[in-house]
A protein has these predicted regions:
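C-terminal non-catalytic regions of proteins with extracellular/luminal or membrane-system context
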Residues: 1-318
Length: 318
């Protein structure tokens, strides 16, 4: 496996024999043969202690309730330079499982259009793939016979490039699987079970083009003597700032599907360049990678209407 791994906050009773499965443990228990050279690299102190969550790169400090410097946020994906020739050779003729993660938490938001402390992590679009993530995926494509991308995140990340990449064999959403969810992920990857879920979010080509993004920020009450306009956000004074969600209900699919309908019907100036991610006339096909409710299966389904019986009284039976 390449990439990061996160799970939701769970509570287990170890004394009662309960276990928490990370992705490595789950894959091993389900009979997968893993690349030990790659595992040793990721677990080494140089890598594990510097990058990823243990390296201090998680949600804090993103853009939330009490952080003075949101620009310090980093994905923490390790650079291409950590992969030695021997490690890369060990990945030849294998199936690469690339894990993409973004943390999430209440009271915190990702802040678009900010400058990162690390040039390899681009945060004009924090839900887009960073340069290091892109480089890691290219390495996987170069050395492995098949590449599967696992989205270990609740956030709908920007993956339009992966969707259109013929070198990517599959993209699987895992969310935050908790204590045992990776066992189910392993069953999906092996084909033991047939995936049939559908995503509950819209995966946008560029999340920053959505109207809700315009309202992101920290706005302090300037007439508040305790805080003032230059105050640092802390746990004690977090009630001194506000956010106006003027987009109303039009977040996620409610925005994209409503504007799509208006675009088709030629109303509401829906096809203007306003809110377009590419500067051209707004076009649903260019704004949405995966729509709300999207999902694939290992099999195919067919729905057929056999007959329709319309009664004189106005009722119909199909």
């Amino acid at each position: 496996t390449l990439g990061g791994m996160i799970g939701s906050s769970v509570s287990i009773d170890a004394e009662a024999g309960q276990k928490q499965y990370d992705i490595q443990t789950a894959l091993t228990e389900k009979g997968f043969s893993l690349n030990q050279d790659m595992l040793d690299l990721y677990s080494s102190e140089d890598v594990n202690g510097t990058y990823g969550r243990k390296g201090g790169h998680s949600l804090q400090p993103s853009f939330g309730t009490m952080y003075e410097n949101p620009a310090a946020y980093k994905v923490g994906e390790a650079p291409e330079s950590i992969y030695t020739d021997d490690v890369l050779k060990s990945a030849d003729d294998t199936v690469a499982l690339v894990v993409i993660s973004r943390d999430s938490s209440e009271a915190s938001d990702y802040n678009p259009n900010m400058t990162s402390a690390d040039e390899a992590d681009s945060y004009e679009r924090p839900l887009a793939l960073s340069d290091n993530e892109k480089a890691m995926i290219e390495l996987a494509k170069e050395h492995s016979t098949k590449v599967v991308v696992l989205l270990n995140t609740n956030n709908p990340v920007e993956i339009d490039d992966l969707k259109n990449d013929e070198g990517i064999g599959a993209i699987v959403w895992a969310g935050e699987p908790g204590a045992n969810g990776f066992l189910g992920v392993a069953d999906v990857l092996s084909g033991e079970v047939n995936p049939s879920g559908h995503i509950a979010d819209t995966y946008a080509v560029n999340s920053t083009s959505a109207p809700a993004m315009v309202n992101y920020g920290v706005y302090l009450y300037t007439n508040n003597s305790q805080a003032g306009s230059d105050a640092v956000l802390t746990e004690e004074n977090k009630a001194d700032w506000y956010l106006v969600e003027s987009e109303g209900i039009y977040t996620g699919y409610k925005y994209y599907e409503t504007r799509y309908e208006d675009e088709i019907l030629g109303q509401g100036n829906a096809d203007t360049t306003e809110g377009s991610s590419d500067g051209a006339a707004w076009d649903y096909a260019n704004e949405v990678s995966y729509p709300f409710g999207y999902g694939l299966s290992y099999t195919t389904f067919e729905q057929k209407l056999e007959s329709v019986d319309v009664q004189v009284g106005g009722t119909a039976t199909a």
